[in-house]
């Protein structure tokens, strides 16, 4: 499942499920899980200030759902690095409500040249930084 959010300092993001994200069944839209996961990865990435990192495109998004979220639920998200490849980095966002796993979303970023969008290698210094967050 992953680490408990309370045991991993500075890797937690939280939100309360708003009305705009609720479907006709009273559950959070599945697409909203992806949006929230991307927000959590963005917050995680903010830790890396002042770096000259490559441009990234989203290469893959995959979600697993365990229990539906409802209006007003308080959700904690833990972001970990799931994989570090030669040209890609994967992030897993673990979502919990009251300590119960509700979903995991993996977001894979591919490093690329910003003008040509051709794949490029992850810089070694960036790979080293990511390793400290490997799940």
Task: Please state what every model-predicted region is.
Residues 99, 107, 126:
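Short, flexible active-site-adjacent loop segments at beta-strand->alpha-helix junctions, enriched
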Residues 2-60, 113-135:
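Hot-dog-fold acyl-thioester-processing enzymes
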Residues 98-100, 117:
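A glycine-centered beta-loop-beta connector
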Residues 43-89, 102-105, 110:
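Hydrophobic beta-strand-centered segment that forms part of the acyl-chain substrate-binding groove
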Residues 94-96:
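Core beta-strand residues in small-molecule sensory/regulatory alpha/beta domains
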């Amino acid at each position: 499942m992953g680490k408990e959010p309370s045991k991993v300092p500075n890797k937690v993001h939280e939100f309360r499920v708003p009305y705009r994200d609720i479907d006709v069944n009273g559950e959070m839209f599945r697409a909203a899980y992806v949006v929230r996961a991307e927000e959590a990865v963005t917050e995680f990435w903010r830790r890396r200030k002042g770096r000259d990192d490559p441009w990234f495109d989203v290469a893959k998004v995959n979600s697993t759902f365990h229990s539906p979220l409802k209006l007003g639920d308080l959700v904690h998200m833990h972001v970990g690095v799931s994989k570090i490849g030669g040209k890609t980095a994967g992030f897993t966002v673990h979502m919990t409500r009251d300590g119960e796993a509700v979903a995991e979303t993996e977001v894979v970023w591919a490093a690329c040249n910003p003008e040509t969008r051709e794949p490029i290698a992850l810089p070694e210094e960036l790979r080293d930084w990511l390793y400290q967050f490997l799940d």
